[in-house]
Amino acid sequence: MSYPVSTSIHFRFDREYKVSLNDQIARIIRGGFTCLDFNFLDWNADLRSPFVGPDWERWIDGAGELAAKMGAKFNQAHAPVYNGLRFPGCTQEDIHEFQLRAIRSCAKLGIPWMVYHAIYTDDPNWMKINHDTFEPLLEEARKCGVGMAFENTWVSLQHVPLWQTEALIELADSYNDPYVGICWDTGHCNMYGGKPELRKYTDQYKEITKLGKRLKALHIDDNNGCIDDHIAPFDGIINWDDVMRALRDIGYEHSFTFEAHNAARRVPESLADERIAYMKRLGDTLVAWDNGFNG
């Protein structure tokens, strides 16, 4: 198997924006990554973020120019969310504007797929709610040549229909559009909340193979089943043989993208570069999988 190994450029850094975007990009590339994920969700948490300011396009252009100069490219993104992280006073109208900015940024950076959180609601009309929310964005995404990949949520969110892989497939298929697909977050699938009766739903091989060619993006991370911890593969309890075998069996052909922020955020600064480089080697090891890992 061979997929481009990618990571979020916010991999090491927090949401206080103490380190510039370009410094983050350079450090990740020096760690060995040549493919980058732009997590726009991380950049609408505070009014200090350049993404929410008037010069956002110049900021995006600068990021693309630096990555290209250093021999790297952006190949995946994460959209802002409607029901989650945002700065104080941020309205739904603001989030919609940032969603459009993210799509146009992907077009500028040559990113083919951006990951979206669906509207995870227990409302019986959840399908209509999602269509009403995302149809306007899909229209813009088509114009920009950017695909929308809906992400699976936690297994433990039993009150929300979209916790089920089948419901996620139903949502993606309802658009009947080549610009709509699915993102699989390995950590979310593992989030059974410590309830033994839910463990059966954390079978990565079974769930991933249901997706088939709908799978357009990955969030690779691990946890211990109770907290969405975003740690490195093999530091939690996920069976990585199952994950890699499933990707092989469905013929997955897109990016292998880490969303394992805490693999690098929690180590001392003196070890950060070493940890970033380790994650690239770990990604290379995973995508080279061939019928099992040793011990």
Residue map of PLM features:
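N-terminal small/glycine-rich loop or linker at the start of catalytic domains
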Residues: 1-10, 75-86
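Histidine-acidic metal/acid-base catalytic patches
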Residues: 1-34, 68, 96, 100, ...
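Active-site acidic/histidine proton-transfer and metal-coordination neighborhood
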Residues: 23, 65-73, 83-184, 191
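Hydrophobic residues within beta-strands of alpha/beta enzymes
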Residues: 36-38, 75-77, 114, 148, ...
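Glycine-rich, proline-tolerant flexible connector loops at the mouths of alpha/beta enzymes
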Residues: 37-63, 121
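Active-site loop/turn elements of alpha/beta-hydrolase fold enzymes
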Residues: 38-43, 79, 116-119, 153, ...
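A short acidic, helix-capping loop that chelates divalent metal ions and anchors anionic groups
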Residues: 44-49, 83-89, 122-125, 190-193, ...
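Catalytic-core regions built around general acid/base machinery
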Residues: 56-69, 133-141, 205-210, 242-246
